[in-house]
Design a protein with these regions (language model features):
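DNA-recognition helix of helix-turn-helix
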Residues: 64, 68, 131-155
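C-terminal edge and immediately downstream basic/flexible tail or linker adjoining helix-turn-helix-like DNA-binding
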Residues: 1-7, 81-83, 93, 129-130, ...
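Arg/Lys-rich amphipathic alpha helix in sigma70-family domain 2
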Residues: 50, 61-81
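A short pre-motif secondary-structure segment
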Residues: 113-117
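A short, charge-rich alpha-helical start-of-domain segment used by transcription regulators
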Residues: 1-19, 23, 32, 43, ...
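Internal acidic/polar
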Residues: 69, 77-104, 123
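C-terminal flanking helix
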Residues: 14, 18, 39, 107, ...
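Structural recognition of an alpha-helix C-terminal capping motif at a helix-to-coil junction
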Residues: 19, 33-40, 53-65
Length: 157
């Protein structure tokens, strides 16, 4: 990937990649480090993308994988600082603020699917393809994730 295309890609997907990383990692420092890793890895890859949607799907999958790598490396640092959470979701309006905060507290397997389905508007079959899981598993994760999300939101009220 050449530098001009990379720069355009970064400008187009900066918010999406950062939100995914922050949802996974829960703090600004790790998210910043992982953000750099995502785009360095994208720059080094020699893959041709069929369309912007193909690039976006590849970027989401790669971002989630890099976030998981950071979890494995830093499993002992599993503490999320509230100040960082509030900073990341400060762009949300009041109605979405509590929902975003609750999503941050879900396990990663639910976060991924809920984020891609509701925030990136992917269909279940597209999510299944990106995450290499069956479509029915996507539906199950969505259902269970919504139930867990409802439980978290009910507790906060």
């Amino acid at each position: 990937m050449d530098k001009v295309v990379l720069e355009k890609t970064i400008n187009k997907y900066v918010d999406m990649v950062y939100r995914i990383l922050f949802c996974h990692l829960g703090n600004k420092a790790d998210s910043d480090d992982a953000f750099q890793d995502v785009f360095i890895k994208l720059y080094k890859c020699n893959k041709e993308f069929e369309s912007d949607e193909h690039l976006k799907a590849y970027l989401i999958k790669m971002t989630a994988n890099i976030a998981n790598d950071y979890h494995r490396k830093n499993f002992w640092r599993n503490k999320i600082e509230l100040q960082d959470i509030y900073q990341a979701v400060s762009d949300c309006d009041d109605d979405n603020y509590e929902v975003m905060d609750a999503i941050l507290h879900l396990p990663n397997k639910y976060k991924n699917v809920i984020y891609m389905y509701y925030f990136e508007d992917y269909k279940a079959n597209e999510i299944a393809g990106i995450l290499n899981i069956p479509v029915n598993t996507v539906y199950s994760l969505l259902k269970r994730g919504k139930e867990k999300l409802k439980g978290v939101l009910d507790e906060s009220l």
